[in-house]
Amino acid sequence: MVKKPFNWWLWTKMLVAGGAIIVGGPALTRWVQPTDEELFQKYNPELQKRSLERRFERQQEFDDFVNRLKRDSKSDKPIWTVQAEAEKERVRQASIAESLKAAEELKARKEAMRREVGLPAESASSETTR
């Protein structure tokens, strides 16, 4: 069986075409894609104003998110487990704060009802009996 000669022209064309695709594709994408400043200039003035007003807030939210990720990644547990535990703790803290707020509102309502009836305030009556 006779060995086929190596087709240098075919491999050269393939390498050139592959290089053009590998380098040219991302280069074309970068050339066509507008920058953030160009997009911002295309906004109408109201959207530009709103975007500028919310910029600091969005940057702060992103910084908080990154800091939480850094803090959570220091744990030996998987990050999704740590985030789930943190969410449970946040929900628990929110429910505690809500119950404290409800207790304060209840106390304020009781005080208002006592004042309407003409009874002395509860805190004042407890101080005089001691």
Curated annotation (Swiss-Prot):
Region (Disordered): 111-130
Annotated keywords: Chaperone, Coiled coil, Membrane, Mitochondrion, Mitochondrion inner membrane, Transmembrane, Transmembrane helix
Biological process (GO), any one: mitochondrial respiratory chain complex III assembly
Subcellular location: Mitochondrion inner membrane
Domain of life according to the entry: Eukaryota
InterPro entries to which the protein is assigned, alphabetical: Cbp4
Sequence intervals crossing the membrane: 7-29
Function: Essential for the assembly of ubiquinol-cytochrome c reductase. It has a direct effect on the correct occurrence of the Rieske protein, core 4, core 5 and apocytochrome b.
Membrane topology classification: Single-pass membrane protein
Gene it is expressed from: CBP4
Entry's family note: Belongs to the CBP4 family.
Pfam family, one: CBP4
A GO cellular component annotation in the UniProt record: mitochondrial inner membrane
PANTHER family: ASSEMBLY FACTOR CBP4
Coiled-coil regions listed: 93-118
Record protein name field: Assembly factor CBP4
